[in-house]
Amino acid sequence: MKLVPLGDKVVLKQLVAEETTKSGIVLPGQAKEKPQQAEVVAVGPGGMVDGKEVTMQVKVGDKVIYSKYAGTEVKLDEEEFIVVKQNDIVAIVAD
């Protein structure tokens, strides 16, 4: 199965969060912050959203930064994804 987003929605796969701090302290599961960096795995078609034409600016494979509390978490075939509106993506990480 695969997720196919509608409208201006984007499916993200969260990148793994750091398990140790810069000073070498190992963080237990509850102490780790929710990562805000993810890879785009699917992009909706855009189109009319709330009466405005939306052009999708991200593409599959882009690494992005998204708003901390944005989106809906989804588990599919033992994999976890987050579905966000394109508007909740604040930046594309350029190499």
From Swiss-Prot:
Coiled-coil annotation reads none
Keywords annotated in UniProt? Chaperone, Cytoplasm
Keyword Methyltransferase found: no
Which molecular function terms from Gene Ontology are attached? Answer: ATP binding; metal ion binding; protein folding chaperone; protein-folding chaperone binding; unfolded protein binding
Q: Which Pfam families does the UniProt entry name for this protein?
A: Cpn10
GO CC terms: cytoplasm
| Keyword Cytoplasm in annotation | yes
Query: Which domain of life does the UniProt lineage start with?
Result: Bacteria
One Gene Ontology BP term is:
chaperone cofactor-dependent protein refolding
Location(s) in or outside the cell: Cytoplasm
Please state the span of the N-terminal signal peptide per the UniProt entry.
Answer: none
Function of this protein? Together with the chaperonin GroEL, plays an essential role in assisting protein folding. The GroEL-GroES system forms a nano-cage that allows encapsulation of the non-native substrate proteins and provides a physical environment optimized to promote and accelerate protein folding. GroES binds to the apical surface of the GroEL ring, thereby capping the opening of the GroEL channel.
* Record note on quaternary structure: Heptamer of 7 subunits arranged in a ring. Interacts with the chaperonin GroEL.
Q: Which HAMAP family does this entry report, sorted A to Z?
A: CH10
Q: Which family does it belong to?
A: Belongs to the GroES chaperonin family.
The protein here is known as: Co-chaperonin GroES
